[in-house]
Structure formats: C-alpha cells, structure tokens
Design a protein with these regions (language model features):
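Conserved beta-loop-beta/alpha segment of the NTase-like Rossmann-fold superfamily
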Residues: 1-77, 124-131
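Short coil/turn connectors at secondary-structure junctions
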Residues: 18-21, 51-55, 67-68, 85-86, ...
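A short, charged helix-loop
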Residues: 74-110, 144-145
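A conserved mid-domain beta-alpha-beta active-site/ligand-binding segment of alpha/beta enzyme cores
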Residues: 104, 109-117, 127
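Left-handed beta-helix
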Residues: 120-257
Length: 258
C-alpha cells in the first residue's frame, strides 16, 4: 500500500491511545551513528512539531553527490529557535550526476533521510486537505476501530500512495531538521559492504567463509561454509532457506516476485 496508508493506519492506533500523541516514522534499513546527536535531533523535531503544528522531516548533510537519494532544499534564512530547523523550499527526486553535483555546490540541499515526526492530529489534517481519497477510507477505518470491527475490506480498497508525493510535497507547513548524526541508507549491497571493516584484499567475511584470489567480496553466512575463488565484487548471502549470489555492480534489491 506504500507509505501513506501504512503511516495513516498507525496514526489511528496512536490517536486511540492519545489524541494529542506525536508519532515518528523511521525506515528499518538505515544506519545511524551518534545516538546522542540523533536523540537531540528527535527532541528538536518534537519541539517544532508541537510549536508550529507542523510536519517535520530529517535531512542529512551530503558528503558526496549521490544519485541514490532524494534531496530536500531548505531555506537558510528560516531557522527556527536555533535548533537546526528550517523551512522546506522543495523536495527533489533522485537526481542525475550533474544535478547532484549542483545540489552539493549550492549548499542548501540535504539528503532526504525519510525520517518523519509530527502530531497525529497534524497528519490527519494534512491528509484531509491533500489526500481526500485516502482520508475517506481512513475515516471509515476509524469508525470500524471504534466499534472494534474488522476493516480489512476497506483496506483492500485503498490505492497505494507515497506520503512524500501525496502530502509532504504539497503542504506548506513543513520543516526539515538539519541532522548532525552520521547516516547511511543500507538499501543496497554496496552500502552494506561499505559499512563493514575490510580484511585482506578488501574482502568481508561474516560467519563461515573463505576467499582465494578475489577482491572486494562480501560473504554473510552464519552456518554454511562458503568459498569464493578467483572472483571479485561478489555478494554471497546464506540463510536457512535461501542463498543469494549477486554482483556488487548490480543495484537490484530484490529477486522476482514469483
């Protein structure tokens, strides 16, 4: 169903516990280093969410012109309360290389970390204004939840929608916290490889494995012994019921749906 319906459904559950509740949305495949800085960024986001009845997102200072991430342009003159919170000018999709370089050179673009903080009431107001179809379904689900009835038939009718496209890019009451913690999206095997410390020939072995005459390989195999001979830039992942073998040059994140 994509992010908007899922976030809205969770907000309904939070609202039931506390109508004035604040919710956070955190992607599961992100690496965050610097827990105290991360904690402070969340505190700052909560402050703005309450003070301005606003939607808050997190932006990370780019370290290179990545084409794998979306970007957020912020208004440098609009800092709120000296807590690294800025008004959002625009969202930008994953750019081509030249555009990514221009983003970096401008100094007012951040990587979009996909982390969101807001009051559930603010979220529902935004959905009501900018996503009327989803809002109608959410209202029906709210009624079912109040009656402790199943809402699965309504859920099936909801069209997949992204919270970014459906709401964040349309609303004006949105701020970005300029994060100071280290961040990495582990959404590709190259990102996972970059995270680990390298051994001889820049190979990484976690679990049972061996590499001979090969460089920059990644083996994650807790139980099965895996050997790589004469091959470079390979990823081998062993689990109880499956084995994945893929080139690091490939950015494919999934194997077919069948």
């Amino acid at each position: 169903k994509n992010t908007a319906p899922a976030i809205a459904l969770m907000a309904l559950h939070i609202e039931k516990i506390n109508p004035k509740g604040i919710m956070g949305v955190f992607p599961a495949d992100h690496l965050i280093v610097g827990h105290k800085k991360f904690q402070q960024a969340i505190i700052n986001a909560i402050h703005l969410a309450k003070k301005d009845d606003a939607l808050i997102t997190m932006g990370v200072q780019p370290t290179f012109p990545s084409t794998a991430y979306g970007y957020i342009q912020f208004d440098e003159k609009s800092e709120e309360d000296h807590i690294d919170g800025y008004g959002v000018v625009t969202f930008a999709e994953k750019p081509h290389q030249d555009l990514a370089k221009r983003f970096i050179e401008s100094g007012d673009f951040l990587w979009n970390a996909g982390i969101f903080i807001w009051q559930v009431s603010t979220l529902f107001s935004g959905i009501e204004k900018h996503m009327p179809d989803l809002n109608e379904h959410i209202e029906n689900i709210r009624e079912r939840l109040n009656k402790k009835e199943s809402f699965h038939d309504i859920w099936k009718q909801i069209s997949p929608e992204s919270i970014d496209y459906g709401l964040l890019e349309k609303t004006k009451n949105i701020f970005v916290i300029k994060a100071k913690f280290d961040w990495n999206d582990l959404g590709s095997w190259n990102a996972v490889y970059d995270y680990f410390m390298k051994a001889k020939d820049e190979n990484i072995i976690r679990g049972k494995g061996y590499v001979q005459s090969g460089q920059q390989n990644l083996i994650l195999s807790p139980d099965k012994f895996t050997a790589i001979i004469g091959v470079d830039n390979l990823v081998v992942i062993n689990t109880d019921d499956a084995t994945l073998v893929v080139s690091k040059r490939s950015e494919e994140r999934r194997v077919g749906k069948e």
